[in-house]
Amino acid sequence: MVKVTFNSALAQKEAKKXEPKSGEEALIIPPDTXAVDCKDPDEVVPVGQRRAWCWCMCFGLAFMLAGVILGGAYLYKYFALQPDDVYYCGIKYIKDDVILNEPPANAPAARYQTIEENIKIFEEDGVEFISVPVPEFADSDPANIVHDFNKKLTAYLDLNLDKCYVIPLNTSIVMPPRNLLELLINIKAGTYLPQSYLIHEHMVITDRIENIDHLGFYIYRLCHDKETYKLQRKETVKGIQKREASNCATIRHFENKFAVETLICS
């Protein structure tokens, strides 16, 4: 039988080695702290770079907000802007030469024809928008017309040719928006039954307009993406030659107490 014994002196010596000295302190580092403080240098973003990125983001958001505001204002004016009044009405006129005096009692009854059109009045902006549909019987062309009193311009859009024509506003023919509005209200109420005459104006096409931005919002809206030309008034000649008339667009419309036949010739 073998008896196993331990040397007590050796055990005490090993225990003394494991104990810290009286003048020393034990430093204990938590494992989590070591994991947080020890980062990969590639993952550390410099302070200046972070600040520059923040400024770029702020400027980008500011530009986006400005674009949304400006775009919203433009879309509101383009789509949501409604005219003060919209009217669909007509006027009767004599197709023959203008008769200002009373006809004799035995004279035959005058041959009246009718023009019907849509009229939108933007009174605050000083603009009249006239839409002439395809006539049923008259030999005239459909068109959209803008009279801009602020820009002092008139624009015709020939719907058959899809071309625009611009000319200075003729205030002797076109009523101002407020006066035209009163006339239309009276026609609608039946207090004024228009039976009028037809006057003629003859225009010729001159130069092409490459940039229409300066023509105002309403004319730009009418003529955007269309070939646009300048017009020049020509002295009306009684009995226009057929060859000349064949090269003309004929637009019959009214924005006064009388009807107007506009010839636009190349």
Swiss-Prot record:
PROSITE patterns: BRICHOS. GO terms for cellular component: endosome membrane; extracellular space; Golgi apparatus; Golgi membrane; Golgi-associated vesicle membrane; organelle membrane; plasma membrane. Residues 76-266 are lumenal. One of its GO terms (molecular function) is amyloid-beta binding. Residues 1-54 are cytoplasmic. Glycans are attached at residue 170. The ectodomain C-terminal part of the imBRI2 is processed by furin producing a secreted Bri23 peptide and a mature BRI2, membrane form (mBRI2). The remaining part of the ectodomain of mBRI2 containing the BRICHOS domain is cleaved by ADAM10 and is secreted (BRI2C, soluble form). The membrane-bound N-terminal fragment (BRI2C, membrane form) is further proteolytically processed by SPPL2A and SPPL2B through regulated intramembrane proteolysis producing a secreted C-peptide and a BRI2 intracellular domain (BRI2 ICD) released in the cytosol. Glycosylation at Asn-170 is important for cell surface localization, but doesn't affect furin- and ADAM10-induced proteolytic processing. The record marks 243-244 as: Cleavage. The keyword Protein biosynthesis does not apply. Pfam families: BRICHOS (PF04089). Residues 137-231 form the BRICHOS domain. Keywords: Cell membrane, Disulfide bond, Endosome, Glycoprotein, Golgi apparatus, Membrane, Secreted, Signal-anchor, Transmembrane, Transmembrane helix. Disulfide bonds join 164-223, 248-265. Residues 102-134 are annotated as: Necessary for interaction with APP and inhibitor effects on APP processing. The chain crosses the membrane at residues 55-75. GO terms for biological process: negative regulation of amyloid precursor protein biosynthetic process. PANTHER family: INTEGRAL MEMBRANE PROTEIN 2B, INTEGRAL TRANSMEMBRANE PROTEIN 2. Plays a regulatory role in the processing of the amyloid-beta A4 precursor protein (APP) and acts as an inhibitor of the amyloid-beta peptide aggregation and fibrils deposition. Plays a role in the induction of neurite outgrowth. Functions as a protease inhibitor by blocking access of secretases to APP cleavage sites. Mature BRI2 (mBRI2) functions as a modulator of the amyloid-beta A4 precursor protein (APP) processing leading to a strong reduction in the secretion of secretase-processed amyloid-beta protein 40 and amyloid-beta protein 42. Belongs to the ITM2 family. Homodimer; disulfide-linked. Interacts with SPPL2A and SPPL2B. Interacts with APP. Mature BRI2 (mBRI2) interacts with the APP amyloid-beta A4 protein; the interaction occurs at the cell surface and in the endocytic compartments and enable alpha- and beta-secretase-induced APP cleavage inhibition. Mature BRI2 (mBRI2) interacts with the APP C99; the interaction occurs in the endocytic compartments and enable gamma-secretase-induced C99 cleavage inhibition. May form heterodimers with Bri23 peptide and APP amyloid-beta protein 40. This is Integral membrane protein 2B.
